[in-house]
Swiss-Prot record:
Binding site for D-glucose 6-phosphate: 151, 181-185, 219, 238, 337, 342, 373
Gene3D superfamilies in UniProt: Dihydrodipicolinate Reductase, domain 2, NAD(P)-binding Rossmann-like Domain
Residue sites binding NADP(+) 1 per the record: 17-24, 51, 151
One Gene Ontology term from the biological process aspect of the record: pentose-phosphate shunt, oxidative branch
Protein name in the entry: Glucose-6-phosphate 1-dehydrogenase
Pathway noted in the entry: Carbohydrate degradation; pentose phosphate pathway; D-ribulose 5-phosphate from D-glucose 6-phosphate (oxidative stage): step 1/3
Amino acid sequence: MTSTPDSRSVLTVIILGASGDLAKKKTYPALFGLYLRDLLPSNTIIYGYARSHIEIGDFKARISKGLKGDEEKKKQFLNLLHYHSGKYDEKASYDEFEKLILAEEKKQQGVDKFNRLFYMAIPPSIFIEVSIGIHGSLISKNGWSRVIVEKPFGRDLASSRELVSELGKLFKEKDLFRIDHYLGKEMVQNLMVLRFANAVFEPLWSKSHISSITITFKEDIGTEGRGGYFDQFGIIRDVMQNHLLQVLSLVAMEPPVSLNADDITNEKVKLLRCIQPIKMSEVVLGQYTSDPEGKIPAYLDDEGVPKDSTTPTYAAAVFHINNPRWRGMPFILKCGKALDERKTEVRIQFKRPDNFLFSDDDISRNELVMRIQPGEAVYLKLLSKKPGLENKIEQTELDLSYRHRFENLDLPDAYERLILDSIKGDHNLFVRDDELDVAWQIFTPLLDQIEKEKIKPEPYSFGSRGPKSADELSKKFGFIRSLGYNWPGNSPQGSKK
């Protein structure tokens, strides 16, 4: 581990919900990733807290299974781990936990500052009671205390505002770090660099030259036994209201005054406030059924899902931004589970010039595609003369595939970056309270209408492209799909788009 500029301080990372899946699959592996990169402060303590009674040896064995890397480093990292079982709604449990933390902190030599980072890897239903416990017993007396909160941040505007209000009574906004892990992904961070560091793009970045922008999130797995939890939220709350809206705001916002976190968020909030109400006539909802062979369970067959559930596992919606740059140009957001592939991307389709010289209607549009995952890449689809004696046109691309361009590429996990930024106190990749509020203002009326009218989702087969109506919606708003085109052309990962 590395010494920070403030080497006379201790960092205690406290993971609430340490026995849960999120902590095991994301939080601890991210901390281990930072440890491997020597990015944790030299005086670091990692303390887990949960209701489950687990012996420390069993706890470390459980965490170890999710860690990948050098075995000796893994042993060293596991030596940093501690675990305590206690209640979430009892002050005495937090007081006892505080004594244990203090005892560990006092073992550190030559330090006079004790910083604490709290990671709430817990269900949203207990955010408030755990926050009260942190505030009442665990705040550092000599150092900073910061709190990382995982989504979902409420399930509608009213519950989100209640959560923001209650947390605001306990912590200052500068000490709250609301995680949307998509903001930590390499390609999402690259969106601003591509836009504002390359002079070739900004003159084209408007309705004058772009016909549509499609932001897509596809998973090739279903709910896999988590249907009971998923059914409480649905795909719009789970993905579109947060991940995809964050990407949209970065793609569409005006240039910020600076790269300061508040300046960037100010522009994102301005942009979000320009989004017009979503029309139900411009929304497609879907729910996956079994695969054509009947081997994979349908959503309604998942344990915990009511047999009459109308919760969508797929959604597509058209967004209209009422500002000079984008007025009249559609943004199409799509997300779904149990589809034909795993993919997240931004697809910017350009208009043809008015004096287009080629008559073939099948000629594809120019597209700038930013592949967020998997296989991070940026590629520009162009038209070129096909080599030979005939004057035929074919589609090709200028391609920046990260793993081809950058040797020995080892991209950090999004959670690694976000935890590191919270240690630094950098809010650039986190969600501010007013940003969260306007996001719920956009989606709550739509969600209320869907639930009030019990709108039935369109069925689609597990492993398909999704509801047929979604492709029809895109076509209606000017998106032209390039059939038969493979990217990358010589890779088995290529997908026809």
